From Swiss-Prot:
Lineage of source species: Eukaryota, Metazoa, Chordata, Craniata, Vertebrata
Induction section of the entry: By 12-O-tetradecanoylphorbol-13-acetate (TPA) in myeloid leukemia cells.
Protein known as: Lysine-specific demethylase 6B
Name of the gene encoding the protein in the UniProt record: KDM6B
Subunit field text: Interacts with TLE1. Component of the MLL4 complex, at least composed of KMT2B/MLL4, ASH2L, RBBP5, WDR5, and KDM6B. Interacts with TBX21, SMARCA4, SMARCC1 and SMARCC2.
Associated pathology: Stolerman neurodevelopmental syndrome: An autosomal dominant disorder characterized by global developmental delay, variable intellectual disability, poor language acquisition, and dysmorphic facial features including a prominent nasal bridge and coarse features. Some patients manifest autism spectrum disorder. Musculoskeletal features may be present and include widened and thickened hands and fingers, joint hypermobility, clinodactyly of the fifth fingers, and toe syndactyly.
Family membership noted in the UniProt record: Belongs to the UTX family.
GO terms of biological process kind: cardiac muscle cell differentiation; cell fate commitment; cellular response to hydrogen peroxide; chromatin remodeling; endothelial cell differentiation; heart development; hippocampus development; inflammatory response to antigenic stimulus
Organism: Homo sapiens (Human)
Compositional bias of kind Basic residues: 972-989, 1004-1016
Amino-acid positions noted as binding Fe cation in the UniProt annotation, renumbered to this chain: H1390, E1392, H1470
Matching InterPro entries: Corepressor-Demethylase, JmjC_dom, KDM6_GATAL_sf, KDM6A_B-like_C-hel, KDM6A_B-like_GATAL
């Protein structure tokens, strides 16, 4: 179908691939960075005639060029074969395809097709065919090596560029398939639900491009209007090969979707012809049109490529700036198992018209490009052809590609593990790199939306990850979409950040990619089957929601939304897509076992779902550029809008495989909310991810029963039960078709889909909700109505009620009512799977973590369930719930809802979007009429009030919900209105009766169980009965939300997990029960309405569900105990909580103003208790100074010395004889030696008045004062040495003279040495040389080495010294300083910086007199300073001893002789005066003791209050210590842990406020030895989140500010760049890893 992805070197990094080159026969030509004129995109002839011979390549705009060097020149890689005649191979090709159309499960034919393509060096198509052969049972031993060889060849070609430019001799398999399948479509057109299947549009129709397209290089222009693409190649029109994704069904308004065509090939275009000329056309907007598989497949490759070298195509697939020929859709995509060739996938993704200047090649090569240039939409939009249109244009992508992708989606999702290349399809994150391949236009246009696979994620992932779905990789293997960086709220911002910030901080590695123009919002448009991409969950009604989400959702919901006008209905989130995949029964493929997922996918599934990675799982089928469609939906803030939906998804992805983690590293991800993986953690505790033993088996049985029930329901609904669809076909179809197929049908599918189908399932589920979905997978796709038509009445689309339900569920996202009974699940065959995934968290993909697994499971719900109880557990209830009232894929809706809230810059505010959604839902409900609901059992009715899913519906009702919704009569609508009113009343009533009703409901449910002998699942939502649960769900806003919350209460964007979690379904119940308990009527249940309303009222809440099996007699009861995850208030956090709890609570916290919580807990204080009330006698006011006399070196290294010095009760310790015992050579610090070593070294000089040490007189000498004169100046060591020497000589001279005078006047006894007791009135001026820096290790090497002889705790540097963990130099603290003194030199009173300890050694020859006061009295001394008009922290003051004594403050006073070491303990207030000529050396030490740490933090906070700089960045130091030191002291551990806790809270609160405000946050990791940052204005430490401005607009000087100062400069932070130095995941990991170490026994 598509040419193999270009090898890394094949094209210029920034070169985009021209879609025109995609024409089946035309030579491949790379597109210029911008989309070429539409002509370039014109598809080759679609008729069989054109298939035989390649049409002339569409004229490329001058800019189109394949050569990396010259875009305007066609470039053929050296040695690339030129187009050759097909000879007779076309006939063989047609014959094989025709045979496969009849029966896809013919591995021999697939292998033959592969050989045909291989003979023509079309490794992409050959690989797809071989993969399909494997899917259908081909010999892996034989095909595996071939695939590996082809992939190697592709990779090589990709690097050489040969295959990229080589014209395809044989038409792409997808083209042929589509053309031949047209006949089938014509026959079954009506079934598909769209207008009768169109014949493939003639090439001319497709080729003609509006002049705009031709002229516009932008992706939008490049993409021709939907009509053009539709005509050219409607994926929907043409059947797709089994392996190919199903084209999304057109979104025509025809009321009844035509019966689904027979399932030709799994991937065949069972979807209606691509009728969405405008509406239905596959467009970036209608990402849905593309089959999930394709969507998933193409984008995934790109994404994956970036991440995994193994991927054959490291570069992003060429982006088709113009509409690629529709027929060019990924026809060759392997129908089944094998992932699509990466190249194909990449080709499959059209660049969503990328604005000029945004080159994909750039994205590939440059990180910025990957991150920012590649728009998530672009990635998602990647389709073999130009599936996505510019955001504003209708999708150009052909339906066929869509269908093909959908078909393949499943299989692609679960490529055979053994198949080489499976690795390629790894994660959306990987895809991102691939998406880089897309033409710039693709990226640009798609930026708003992710590729189907990444569609949802793309929102979160502005960068590449979102754009192309990762190549199909084993479902389990495929990592979920990029995690953290995909966060919903930040998604959009993230995307923008990626571009803007990258440009700002990383520089645009390529021409900046203009943000893709927002796709026109289509209110009514439920994208074509974008099921794959739940991303599109957003409704058209939620334009604020990023377009990307809409696209996904439209794809997934295309079927369900098709008929319903509910543009508002959001498309199911990725999780749903996954589900949809699951529903289709499919034989386990090598990659996926029916029981594959041990729930592994579940965890991944949720995460992947957001990025549409679920779809990606689909054997690399190309994703629709569905994300573009979302973009269309929200043109205003495509980037931002998308961000939010992906946010939830991205969150889910966080837990996803590391691959995703890589993505977060991107700049764009900077914007993501805390890390992706973490978010998952934050969202869901591991315990919730584990199902009880034996649950997997139970779930299998439930799946089977659900499948049967679904089939029955489908029949009842008037829709033929979806044929099992040959397993291969089903597998292929499952990506989208799965919706129609019971979720439970294929455990294997579930596994594969779990990961990738999460998104697909979401979409699928919506489809399933509609009766038509029961038809083969293609029909579900076909079902999707044109996005623009919100009211299409086609039967296949869900009724407005179902759509509303979906929307409600989506909005509710995380809060799903889990009907314990499986009946609800079984009620809807299709919806069931959907329901399972319906919990796609809106913004809480992250929240889904616990749920994320569940949604995944749901995505492949039942199958997955059987294989992994986890999945099935969540899936069943969700399915049921969905069926009942949330039928419209709630998940998608949830993502939609979250996106609006998440979207920061979106056109509308979150509240506005939610309000709009709520109104839309009500309208839908009214339209639909609630006839079905009314018939529902009373209990059901009550329950529906809370959650439509919970209510039991008669089989008829179930049918109606499943497919009859569209046909709801006017009376039904009236009833719905009435029901809505009832819902409101119930909601209010529930608030009052939440406590009682749950139990009553439970009792009723239990009573029912005995009556029903079939297995039944009782949903216990926090002790809520089904009724109560429903009601509570209806009123998510209720405080009772905690109970019903799981189903009803919307999960907070950050906590989407509940949506998935609630899904831990009770196993599905037999069809009979399902019908009985089927969720409310097709009309939206009150619960759904309430959910929607509640969503608008606030974020959904998380809900955890556990399935408990209860056996009694012949009955097996499954109690889905929904453990409502109580929201932790930030104030309730303690150090016992994990980082996930901290992040979650902090994100949900609402803080007014600045976050000012202390880093210290008063309860942790270790200060000694000193009785200050007792009046001390005079002798105690002069206590003896703690002293130690060292007699040997052994004494110096005794632990007792450390304990004595650091004892909080000893403010100061003098160690006598230290130099002698350690044999320190103090001569190294003598003035003479210093002058010789560096005589020109700077010395700070303090000019003072010489006075007695215990006195401090004013200038008049009449009274003592506290202020101390000490003016500052500078000189050199040599000059000060001269002054010191001369001062000494003068002193000697004066001494001699005084002696002579004494001898002459022996009677005189009043004389006193001037130096010791100068007359205050003499004002003898002296100079004190201080703060001489000896930090230069080279210059002062001998001196510093001598100090290494000291005990470890006294050394300048040691592991036990906090100052050694600062990471940078702090002069005078973690470096040595020298003081040169003359008699009278004073060191005024002070406490050391941040209350750290200090070491001072007197070098001699003179003495120093010390005064010290315990830290306990510092406040009293500070008060004295204030009274005397001197600043305690920064001023020079000399205490009046009498004042201290009068205040009952004991003062330690002693003399320090040469060789004595003084240890100043933490916080000790001290002042020193030299009594002789001497030098001193000193430095600070921060022993790791609780006392030291407490005092350091106290002073840190006090400095902030006093606007004084804390020289020691305590928060920075605390994190460094936590990462590098093992703490065994419980008190110290608690203090540090608490500090980290507060730091994380501060970061999260600050981050969330910025994200909510729409401010982009760029990630800029720290580098080695990078200093801590301080605010340029207030000198407060700025940790992690920096507010940077450029000084005077200069690029050379950047200033860091704290948030307060930055906002003072600009309230809206205009002109301020916000940088993030640590990802939330990094901090969380350090936080959780910091544990109390066992105490050492060495002592």
């Amino acid at each position: 179908m598509h040419r193999a992805v270009d090898p890394p070197g094949a094209r210029a990094a920034r070169e985009a691939f021209a879609l025109g080159g995609l024409s089946c026969a035309g030579a491949w030509s790379s597109c210029p960075p911008h989309p070429p004129p539409r002509s370039a995109w014109l598809p080759g002839g679609r008729c069989s005639a054109s298939i035989g011979q390649p049409p002339l390549p569409a004229p490329l705009p001058p800019s189109h060029g394949s050569s990396s060097g010259h875009p305007s020149k066609p470039y053929y890689a050296p040695g690339a074969p030129t187009p050759r005649p097909l000879h007779g191979k076309l006939e063989s090709l047609h014959g094989c395809v025709q045979a496969l159309l009849r029966e896809p499960a013919q591995p021999g034919l697939w292998e033959q097709l592969g050989q045909l393509y291989e003979s023509e060096h079309d490794s992409e198509e050959a690989t797809r065919c071989y993969h399909s052969a494997l899917r259908y049972g081909g010999s892996f031993a034989e095909l595996g090596p071939r695939i590996g060889r082809l992939q190697q060849a592709q990779l090589w070609n990709f690097h050489t560029g040969s295959c990229q430019h080589r014209a395809k001799v044989l038409p792409p398999l997808e083209q042929v398939w589509n053309l031949l399948h047209l006949e089938h479509k014509r026959n079954y057109g009506a079934k598909r639900g769209g207008p009768p299947v169109k014949r493939a549009a003639e090439p001319p129709v497709v080729q003609p491009v509006p002049p705009a397209a031709l002229s516009g290089p932008s992706g939008e222009e490049g993409l021709s209007p939907g009509g053009k693409r539709r005509r050219g190649c409607n994926s929907e029109q043409t059947g797709l090969p089994p392996g190919l994704p199903l084209p999304p069904p057109p979104l025509p308004p025809p009321p009844p979707p035509p019966p689904p065509p027979p399932p030709p090939l799994p991937g065949l275009a069972t979807s209606p012809p691509f009728q969405l000329t405008k509406p239905g056309l596959w467009s970036t907007l209608h990402g849905d049109a593309w089959g999930p598989e394709r969507k998933g497949s193409a984008p995934p490759e790109r994404q994956e490529q970036r991440h995994s070298l193994p991927h054959p195509y490291p570069y992003p697939a060429p982006a088709y700036t113009a509409h690629p020929p529709g027929h060019r859709l990924v026809p060759a995509a392997p129908p089944g198992p094998g992932p699509r060739p990466p190249g194909a996938e990449s080709h499959g993704c059209l660049p969503a018209t990328r604005p000029p200047g945004s080159d994909l090649r750039e994205s590939r090569v440059q990180r910025s490009r990957m991150d920012s240039s590649v728009s998530p939409a672009a990635t998602t939009a990647c389709v073999p052809y130009a599936p996505s249109r510019p955001p504003g244009l209708p999708g150009t992508t052909t339906s066929s590609s869509s269908s093909s992708s959908s078909n393949t989606g499943l299989r692609g999702v679960e490529p055979n593990p053994g198949i080489p290349g499976a690795d390629h399809y790894q994660t959306p994150a990987l895809e991102v790199s691939h998406h880089g391949r897309l033409g710039p236009s693709a990226h640009s246009s798609r930026k708003p939306f992710l590729g189907a696979p990444a569609a949802t994620p793309h929102l979160s992932l502005p960068p590449g990850p979102s754009s192309p779905p990762p190549p199909p990789c084993p479902r389990l293997l495929r990592p979920p979409p990029p995690p953290a960086w995909l966060k919903g709220p930040a998604c959009r911002a993230a995307r923008e950040d990626g571009e803007i910030l990258e440009e700002l901080f990383f520089g645009t590695e390529g021409p900046p990619r203009p943000a893709p123009p927002p796709l026109p919002h289509r209110e009514g448009f439920l994208g074509p089957p974008a099921s794959r991409f739940s991303v599109g969950t957003q409704d058209s009604h939620t334009p604020p929601t990023p377009p990307t989400p809409t696209t996904s959702s439209s794809n997934s919901n295309s079927g369900s939304h098709s008929s319903s006008p509910a543009g508002p209905v959001s498309f199911p989130p990725p999780p749903y897509l996954a589900r949809s995949i699951d529903p289709l029964p499919r034989p386990p493929s090598p990659a996926q076992n029916p029981q594959d997922p041990p729930l592994v996918p579940l965890t991944l599934a949720l995460p992947p779902a957001p990025p549409s990675s679920c779809h990606q799982n689909t054997s690399g089928s190309f994703r629709r550029p569905e994300s573009p469609r979302p973009r269309v939906s929200f043109p205003k803030t495509p980037e931002v809008g998308p961000g939010p939906p992906p946010g939830p998804l991205s969150k889910a992805p966080q837990p996803v495989p590391p691959g995703v983690g890589e993505l977060p590293a991107r700049g764009p991800r900077l914007f993501d909310f805390p890390p992706t993986p973490l978010e998952d953690q934050f969202e869901e505790p591991a315990e919730f991810k584990i199902l009880p033993d034996g649950l997997a088996n139970i779930m299998k049985m439930l799946d089977e029963s659900i499948r049967k029930e679904e089939e029955q329901q489908q029949h009842e609904a008037g829709v033929a039960p979806q044929p099992p669809l040959k397993e291969p076909f089903a597998s292929l179809q499952s990506p989208f078709p799965t919706d129609t197929a019971p979720t439970t049908t294929a455990p294997a599918v579930a596994v594969t889909t779990t990961t990738t189908t999460t998104t697909t399932t979401t979409a699928t589920q919506e489809e399933e909700k509609k009766p038509p979905p029961a038809l083969p997978p293609p029909p579900p796709l076909a079902k999707f109505p044109p996005p623009s038509q919100p009211q299409p009445p086609p039967p296949p689309p869900p009724s407005p009620a179902s759509l509303l339900k979906s929307l409600a569920s989506v909005l509710e996202g995380q809060k799903y009512c889990y009907r314990g009974t499986g009946a609800a699940v079984s009620t809807r065959p299709g919806p069931l799977p959907t329901t399972q995934y319906s919990p796609g968290p809106p913004s809480g993909a992250t929240a889904l973590p616990p749920t994320s697994a569940a949604p995944s499971a749901q995505g492949s719900p039942q199958p997955s369930a059987s294989s992994s109880s986890q999945f099935s557990t969540s899936g069943g209830p969700w399915a049921r719930e969905r069926r009942a009232g949330e039928e419209p894929v709630p998940g998608p809706m949830t993502p939609t809802q979250p996106p609006p809230p998440l979207s920061l810059p979106p056109a509308r505010s979150e509240s506005e979007v939610l309000e709009e959604i709520s109104r839309a839902c009500e309208t839908l409900v009214e339209r639909v009429g609630r006839s079905a609901t009314d018939p529902a059992d009373p209990v059901d009715t009550a329950e529906p009030a809370d959650s439509g899913t919970e209510r039991l519906l008669p089989p008829a009702q179930a049918k109606e919900e499943a497919g009859g919704v569209a046909a709801v009569s006017g009376s039904c609508k009236r009833r719905q209105k009435e029901h809505q009113k009832e819902h409101r009343r119930h909601r209010r009533a529930c608030k009052d009766s939440v406590g009682r009703r749950p139990r009553e409901g439970r009792a009723k449910a239990k009573a029912k169980v005995p009556k029903e002998k079939s297995r039944r699942v009782l949903g216990n939502l926090d002790l809520q009965s089904e009724e109560i649960q429903g009601r509570e769900k209806s009123r998510p806003d209720l405080g009772g939300a905690s109970k019903a919350k799981p189903p009803t209460a919307p999960a907070p964007p950050s906590a989407p997990a509940p949506s998935a979690q609630p899904t831990p379904p009770s196993a599905s119940v037999p069809g009979k029960k399902a019908r009985e308990e089927a969720p409310g009527p097709p009309g939206v249940s009150r619960a759904d309405m309430l959910k929607l309303r509640s969503l608008s009222e606030g974020p959904p809440k998380e809900l955890k569900i556990r399935l408990i099996k209860v056996e009694s007699g012949d009955k097996e009861t499954f109690i889905a105990s929904e453990v409502e995850e109580r929201r932790l208030r930030m104030a309730d956090l303690t150090i016992s909580h994990c980082a996930a709890d901290v992040v979650r609570a902090s994100r949900n916290a609402k803080v007014k103003g600045k976050f000012r919580e202390s880093y210290l807990s008063p309860a942790q204080s270790v200060k000694p208790k000193i009785n200050t009330e007792e009046k001390l006698p005079r002798e105690k006011l002069n206590p003896p100074t703690p002293s130690i006399y060292l007699e040997s070196k052994r004494d110096a290294f005794s632990p007792v010395l450390l304990q004595f010095c650091t004892d909080p009760r000893n403010p100061i310790t003098v160690i006598r004889g230290l130099a002698g015992s350690l044999r320190l050579n103090l001569g190294l610090f003598s003035t003479k030696t210093l002058v010789e070593a560096s005589g020109e070294h700077t010395v700070e000089v303090r000019t003072q008045v010489q006075q007695p040490s215990d006195e401090n007189w004013d200038l008049t000498g009449t009274r003592q004062i506290w202020p101390c004169e000490s003016s500052r100046s500078h000189t050199t060591i040599a000059k000060y040495a001269q002054y010191q020497a001369s001062s000494f000589q003068e002193s000697l001279q004066e001494e001699k003279e005084s002696e002579d005078e004494e001898s002459e006047e022996p009677d005189s006894t009043t004389g006193t040495p001037p130096s010791s007791a100068p007359d205050p009135k003499n004002h003898h001026i002296i100079k004190f040389g201080t703060n001489i820096d000896l930090s230069d290790a080279k210059r002062w090497k001998p001196q510093l080495q001598e100090l290494l002889k000291l005990p470890a705790f006294m050394r300048v540097t040691s592991t036990g010294n906090m100052l050694s963990h600062v990471g940078h130099t702090i002069l005078g603290m973690n470096t040595v300083q020298l003081y040169m003194k003359v008699p009278g030199s004073r060191t005024p009173g002070h406490q050391e910086n941040n209350n750290f300890c200090s070491v001072n050694i007197n070098i001699g020859p003179g003495d120093c007199e010390w005064f010290a006061v315990h830290e306990h009295y510092w406040e009293t001394i500070s008060a004295f300073c204030d009274r005397h008009g001197v600043d305690y922290l920064t001023g020079s003051w000399w205490p009046i001893l009498d004042d201290l004594y009068a205040s009952n403050i004991p003062v330690y006073r002693f003399v320090q002789r040469p060789g004595d070491l003084v240890w100043i303990n933490a916080g000790t207030v001290h002042w020193v005066q030299a009594t002789g000529w001497c030098n001193n050396i000193a430095w600070n030490v921060g022993p790791l003791t609780a006392y030291q740490y407490q005092l350091a933090l106290e002073r840190y906070e006090w400095n902030e209050v006093k606007n004084v700089k804390s020289i020691v960045p305590m928060i920075h130091v605390s994190w460094n210590v936590a990462r590098t030191v093992k703490i065994s002291d419980p008190d110290l551990f608690k203090m540090i842990k608490f500090c980290l806790l507060q730091s994380m809270k501060h970061c999260q609160v600050q981050r969330e406020s910025l994200v909510r405000a729409g401010k982009k946050i760029a990630y800029q990791g720290r580098v080695k030895d990078e200093p801590a940052y301080y605010c340029n204005e207030c000198d407060v430490e700025v940790f992690n989140i920096l507010f940077v401005t450029s000084e005077n607009g200069s690029r050379n000087t950047y200033l860091v500010h704290c948030e307060g100062c930055a906002r003072r400069r600009s309230a809206g932070l205009q002109g301020v760049v916000v940088l993030e130095q640590y990802r939330t995941e990094e901090l969380a990991q350090a936080y959780d890893a910091f544990t109390l170490a066992p105490a050492s026994t060495s002592r």
